[in-house]
Regions:
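Nucleotide and nucleotide-moiety/phosphate-recognizing core
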Residues: 2-161, 169-185, 192-196, 200-206
Length: 208
């Protein structure tokens, strides 16, 4: 028996090189880490959560979640993390039909993310769905059926494919839309300036 609620994977492998190093997901925004915010927003929407990260998994032990490393070597990018999550779902949660992927540097994910992705996919009758805010697509924030994993593995290993959009286009991807104002729900943090803007957004949201 399958479940409509997907497995959620947080792609937490990004390093904050422009912000002194370390895991970006551990940066604090409004008194809480980005990872805490991501998990808090995603947990009610998913059957279970895992973290995709390479290196020492113990650094995420406080989450209580399974930490799954890439099976493709040489840091092959977010598609490798998505494949790791699809493989984990097939092995540990066979009733799960889909995986929803989010990056570990987006602290303001919407609480209706999964519902809108599922709705967009059903309406378009495509296997995949991704988020868009304003006129900007977010291919890593997406819904993936577990049964694309073998094709994804071939694309990564045999073809050296690395671009999410190139892979998604092969299968068909629906788009779920969100407004980008008063703030972008998929705002991500890549610099000290982004972190300062995220603090401003967090303050606005607390006062809303």
């Amino acid at each position: 028996m399958t479940t409509d609620r997907p497995l959620g994977v947080v792609l937490a492998g990004g390093l904050a090189r422009r912000m002194g190093g370390g895991d970006k997901a551990r940066l604090r925004i409004g008194g809480r880490t980005i990872l805490e915010r991501v998990l808090e927003g995603l947990k009610p929407q998913c059957a279970a959560l895992i973290v995709n990260a390479n290196g020492d998994p113990a650094r995420f032990s406080d989450t209580g979640l399974a930490v799954v490393a890439d099976s493709i070597p040489d840091f092959a990018g977010p598609l490798a993390g998505i494949l790791a999550a699809l493989d984990w779902a097939a092995a540990h949660s066979p009733e799960t039909a889909d995986v929803v992927s989010v990056p570990g540097d987006c602290p303001f994910l919407p609480h209706d993310l999964v519902a809108r992705l599922l709705s967009a996919r059903a309406a378009a009758r495509t296997p995949l769905a991704c988020a868009r805010s304003g006129d900007r697509r977010h291919p890593v924030i997406a819904l993936w059926p577990v049964d694309v994993r073998d094709d994804l593995r071939r694309a990564l290993v045999d073809e050296g494919l690395r671009k999410i959009e190139a892979f998604s286009a092969r299968h068909g991807v629906a788009v779920a839309d969100w407004p980008a104002l008063p703030f972008d729900p998929f705002f991500n943090i890549n610099s000290p300036e982004d972190a300062a803007e995220a603090e401003r957004i967090a303050t606005l949201r607390c006062g809303a």
